[in-house]
Amino acid sequence: MSTPFPATLRTLDPSLRAALPGLMLATLTLLFGMGLGVIFGLNEDAIKSRLSAAAAAAPAAVYQQDAAAIKVVLDKSWVYMQRAHLHGGSLGTIAVVLTLLVVLLGTRPLVTRAISLGLGAGGLGYSVFWLWAGFRAAALGSTGAAKESLKWLAMPSSGAVVVATIAVGVLLVLAFAPRRHPSTGHATRPLLTAH
C-alpha cells in the first residue's frame, strides 16, 4: 500500500524539506523561462506589435517623432524580453542545482531554507525584471528609464542570487575545512550539521 503524499513529505530529510519552498520557486522560474520561449515562438509578431503600439501611444515629447529613436528602443525592448527568457532558464537551473548541493552537504535546515529561497525568489524576480523592463521601455522611450523604474525589483533579486551563491561557495569551503570543537577536540562543521 502506498503512503499518501503528506506522510511522505513528513519523512523527508529535514534539510530537503527546508529546501522545498526555494525549489518550488526555482521550478516556477524554469517554467517562466520556458513559457516565455513558447510564447515568444508563437507570438513574436504580436508582442512586437504591442511594443510598437506602446511607443506610438507615448507622449510626443518622449520620442520627439524620431523614428530612429523609436526603432532603437523597440529593438532593445525585444532584447530585454529575450533576456527574461534566458535568465529564467539559467537562474532556475542554477537555483535547483545549488539548492540540491546545499542539501547534499547536510546543511542545517534554516541555512538551507535561506539559501534556497534566495536562489529561487531571486532568480524569479530578476527574470521578471527583464520582461517588465522590456514592456516598460517602449512607453517610457528609454531602456535606461525602464531599468531605473524597476531598480526596486532588480537590485534585491539579483543581490539575493549573488549572496546565496556566495553562501554556497562558503559552505563548500567549510565542507573541506572541518574545525575542532574546543571542549571535545572532535572535528565539527557547525553550519553543515543538520542535526
Predicted regions and their residues:
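Polytopic transmembrane helical bundles with strong interfacial aromatic enrichment
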Residues: 2-72, 77-79, 99-134, 155-195
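Individual transmembrane alpha-helix segments
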Residues: 70-94
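Interfacial non-cytosolic loop connecting adjacent transmembrane helices
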Residues: 132-153
